[in-house]
Structure formats: C-alpha cells, structure tokens
Amino acid sequence: MNKVVIAGGTGFIGMSLAQHLSERGFHPVIIGRNKPKDLTKYEFIQWDAVNPGDWVHALENAHAIINLTGKTVDCIKTPENCDLILRSRVESTRNIGKALKEVSNPPKVWVQMSTAHIFGDPPTILCTESSSTGYGLAPFVGKAWEEALLQSLPSGIREVRLRTSFVMGKNGGALVKLKR
C-alpha cells in the first residue's frame, strides 16, 4: 500500500491533495486537530501537533509525510495571531521530526510546506535558492519553519520544501474571497 500521511490535511490544500493522491492509487491518511464533519472518504487520526502520540504509528511504512500544518495567515495580524502563525508551524515540524525517529520504517520523503514569501516581496528580482531572505513576518516565519525542518530531519529521509504563495482553486483558497 502506498500510504501518504498528510499532517494538517483538513484544509483546502490538504483535502485537494488527498483527493489527487487517492485518484492515483495512494492511501491518504489525514492527521489534524479536529476532524471535519464531512471527512468520511479518508482515514483521519487526531493529534495535538506538539506531542508524539497514538498518531505516530501512521508514519510506519508510509511512502511520504507531507506537513501542511499551521494557523492560517488569512487573519488580522495581532501579536497573538503572529505568535500562533509561527509556533503552529515550528512546533508541529519539530513534533513530526521526533515522531519519525520513533518508527522502524519511516517515510522515504518529507514534503514540508513553506512560503514563497521567505524572500520578501522584491518587485524586480527573480528569486532562486541562493537569494537572500527578506524582512518581516513572512520571511521570519519561513526561515524559522525551514530551520525547524532541517534540525528535525532524520538522516536518510529526503526533504522537499514546498514554497507556496497565494493558493487558489475553484472551491477554496484565496480565489473564493477574491470573487466576493
């Protein structure tokens, strides 16, 4: 069985990804804090995102772990929300790293959500992997998130950083709000 574990998979990206993977013969396992009422199609395991627990067994013999966890950035940037945006990403990433060290047959690849805004918003510069990071909340969070990945990554597991920007789709993401 080609099991793929999606941490933080109850949002727009996670559910779209689960459907895509399922259509291609993979078995998505969604890990999240709260099970959506309409989530009946995929296996769901509850976690608190900061402590290893019963969910760790899902990583055993999985093909991949995909970490999409984190408080939505679509909120008013109060000090409390900014802190939650940072901590929800960094703590969950560290937690996954701890859990991967507990299983006998961990996934071969860890796909880690990040942000294209790690470089800031340079208006005329084409950014590459060697570009300087920017300043502000998004670059700060992006750097901390990726550093947590690098510090938590067990040897032998390939890492992929998925640096997204605005996510849009017919039924979710930023497009729904932009249509209003």
Predicted regions and their residues:
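Conserved Rossmann-fold NAD(P)-dependent oxidoreductase catalytic core, especially the SDR/UDP-sugar
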Residues: R94-G136
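Short, polar loop motifs at secondary-structure junctions
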Residues: I30-K37
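Rossmann-fold NAD(P)-dependent oxidoreductase module
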Residues: S16, H20, A99, A148
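Conserved beta-loop-beta element that borders a ligand/cofactor-binding pocket
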Residues: T115, E147-K170
